[in-house]
């Protein structure tokens, strides 16, 4: 399994190298607007991925609620408590949050201090979104990927040769997958942020760009 962990880590590094030049495409598109059309299909694919992640997040929310209900009934009605039941709703909650983040970014569903933004024109909003992505979103998500690397390596057993399965004897043996949600969250946020930037450039340059179906 340690070989799998190392391979997974190298895969993330390659992905990071691949994303670095791609992240510059929206900025280059400001000077060469025709690029927005060339990358339109990629943007649509990312938007579709955001929709899929939102659907997964919705089912995860249902599983979380059901898991919490089962845990309460087992504890206060039958006097039973199992770590794996608790793990179900904790893991489901984490999946719901991590997967829904990119989908919410696609639809503008994240909480923002909306004092001036709502009064801006569509083009002004696009400029704000573009600046915010490059000053805040991309640096923060890249920092998450970089800083979380050692923790992810330990979870997958790259250092000890054993994957982290559970902190409790009767817990779900999926702790390494649970911790993998963090880099998945960062990567999907970067991808969706990139798609939003391409959409913002199209708005700024008055270029019609087809939305994801």
Model-derived features: positions:
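Alpha-helical transmembrane segments and membrane-interface helix-loop junctions
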Residues: 1-213
């Amino acid at each position: 399994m340690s070989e799998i962990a190392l391979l997974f880590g190298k895969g993330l590094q390659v992905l990071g190298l691949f994303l670095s030049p791609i992240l510059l495409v929206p900025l280059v598109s400001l000077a060469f607007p025709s690029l927005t059309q060339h990358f339109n299909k990629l943007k649509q694919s990312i938007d579709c991925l955001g929709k899929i992640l939102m659907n997964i997040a919705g089912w995860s929310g249902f599983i979380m609620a059901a898991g919490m209900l089962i845990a309460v009934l087992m504890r206060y009605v039958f006097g039973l408590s199992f770590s794996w039941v608790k793990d179900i709703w904790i893991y489901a909650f984490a999946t719901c949050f991590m997967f829904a983040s990119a989908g919410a970014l696609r639809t503008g569903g994240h909480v923002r201090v909306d004092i001036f933004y709502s009064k801006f024109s569509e083009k002004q909003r696009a400029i704000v979104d573009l600046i915010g992505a490059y000053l805040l979103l991309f640096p923060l998500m890249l920092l998450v990927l970089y800083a979380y690397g050692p923790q992810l390596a330990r979870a997958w057993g790259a250092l000890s040769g054993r994957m982290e399965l559970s902190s409790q004897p009767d817990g779900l043996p999926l702790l390494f997958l649970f911790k993998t949600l963090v880099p998945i969250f960062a990567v999907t946020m970067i991808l969706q942020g990139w798609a939003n930037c391409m959409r913002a450039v199209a708005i700024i340059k008055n270029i019609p760009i087809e939305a994801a179906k």
